[in-house]
From Swiss-Prot:
This is Vacuolar ATPase assembly integral membrane protein VMA21. It is a multi-pass membrane protein. GO terms for biological process: vacuolar proton-transporting V-type ATPase complex assembly. Belongs to the VMA21 family. Its main location: endoplasmic reticulum. Residues 52-66 are lumenal. The chain crosses the membrane at residues 31-51, 67-87. It is found in: Endoplasmic reticulum membrane; Endoplasmic reticulum-Golgi intermediate compartment membrane; Cytoplasmic vesicle, COPII-coated vesicle membrane. One of its GO terms (cellular component) is ER to Golgi transport vesicle membrane. InterPro entries: Vma21. The lineage of its organism: Eukaryota, Metazoa, Chordata, Craniata, Vertebrata. Associates with the V0 complex of the vacuolar ATPase (V-ATPase). Interacts with ATP6AP2. It comes from Gallus gallus.
Length: 102
């Protein structure tokens, strides 16, 4: 059985690990970005649309503005989810194509 020193093993596995590390970093960055969007955007749009659009501009009652602001928040959640799926799908096919060409 051959003995491999640490430098030889590191040199053999380093390029593959670094490629996976970049892919993992990119995936984590995408996930954190869309997580932040998923938390802040619907909540922010809920309160801002309730106060400024529905009650302020359109003059709706408090009860009606709650209802329509909730619809805005739900639509926003669906838009963010659709954007995440699109970006994740595009990133996955790009990585698959790059791996296929190697």
């Amino acid at each position: 059985m051959e003995r491999y020193d640490k430098a030889t093993l590191n040199a053999a596995f380093a390029p593959e690990f670094r490629q996976n590390e970049g892919s993992l970093t990119s995936t984590l960055r995408t996930l954190l970005f869309f997580t932040a969007l998923m938390i802040t955007l619907p909540v922010g749009l809920y309160f801002s649309s309730k106060a400024y659009i529905f009650e302020g501009t359109l003059g709706m009652s408090n009860r009606d503005s709650y209802f329509y602001a909730a619809i805005v928040a739900v639509v926003t959640v669906h838009v963010v989810l659709a954007m995440f799926v699109y970006v994740a799908w595009s990133e996955g096919t790009r990585q698959w194509r790059e791996g296929k060409q190697d």
